[in-house]
């Protein structure tokens, strides 16, 4: 266990991960942040680490654009993305190439600072759920040890059933509460595949013990999240 339970009242943290890289995590994080902000929650996003860029995190900049706000002071001072690497690879390798180390407590302290200022922090991961942050620490294990709930981004493209079920199984084995699946329809080519994949994923949520988690569509008009969906994400029934 990396972290001790804190008793200080602070903002909630939700982790955002995906079944693969390039699945739409950044867009989903920004749009979810906007949805929560519009319902009255003071919301900020954070990127656990970013590779392949310099200066301000490109994903954080995209979040702000989608939220309809300017870059914040916490973006410019690195709080919302404590680790930036030029080398475009998994964080553990990018850090090695640049002769640096990722300290999980540096990330945690940055999140604490944001929790003191906001009601809700959406923490976007890197790549998929099992991407290593360091040679010893996977993103999923970081989320588990921090006690965060998780929003998982899936998609309608071929192969998503396998990747999604593997991710749900990894969460179930670790005791990570899956709060929602965002179903990215930008990838769909055949409506029969898209519709069936969504049905299989919804059934899998129940099978793995996440039956209260909504499946929210992402399409060209944005997120199809209803106020009730947002409430279930933040305050799951029975918890």
Curated annotation (Swiss-Prot):
Task: List the NCBIfam families hit by this protein, alphabetically.
Answer: bioD
Q: Active site: which residues?
A: 47
Gene name of the record = bioD
Keywords linked to the UniProt accession:
ATP-binding, Biotin biosynthesis, Cytoplasm, Ligase, Magnesium, Metal-binding, Nucleotide-binding
The protein's assembly and partners: Homodimer.
Give the source lineage, highest ranks first. Answer: Bacteria, Pseudomonadati, Chlorobiota, Chlorobiia, Chlorobiales
Subcellular location, principal:
cytoplasm
Q: Which domain of life is it from?
A: Bacteria
Name recorded for this polypeptide: ATP-dependent dethiobiotin synthetase BioD
């Amino acid at each position: 266990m990396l972290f001790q339970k804190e008793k200080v009242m602070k903002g909630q943290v939700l982790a955002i991960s995906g079944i693969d890289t390039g699945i739409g995590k950044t867009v989903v994080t920004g749009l979810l942040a906007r949805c929560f902000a519009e319902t009255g929650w003071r919301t900020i996003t954070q990127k656990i680490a970013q590779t392949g860029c310099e200066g301000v995190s490109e994903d954080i900049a995209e979040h702000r654009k989608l939220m309809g706000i300017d870059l914040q002071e916490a973006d410019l001072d690195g709080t919302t993305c404590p680790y930036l690497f030029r080398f475009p690879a998994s964080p553990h390798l990018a850090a090695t190439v640049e002769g640096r180390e990722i300290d999980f407590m540096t990330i945690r302290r940055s999140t604490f600072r944001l929790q003191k200022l906001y009601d809700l922090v959406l923490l976007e991961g890197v790549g998929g759920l099992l991407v290593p942050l360091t040679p010893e620490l996977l993103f999923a294990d970081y989320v588990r040890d921090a006690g965060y709930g998780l929003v998982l981004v899936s998609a309608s493209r071929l192969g998503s059933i396998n990747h999604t079920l593997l991710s749900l199984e990894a969460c179930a084995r670790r005791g990570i509460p899956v709060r929602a699946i965002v179903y990215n329809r930008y990838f769909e080519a055949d409506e029969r595949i898209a519709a069936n994949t969504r049905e299989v994923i919804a059934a899998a949520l129940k099978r793995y013990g996440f039956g209260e988690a909504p499946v929210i569509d992402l399409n060209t008009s944005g997120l199809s999240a209803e106020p009730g969906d947002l409430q279930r994400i933040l305050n799951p029934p029975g918890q």
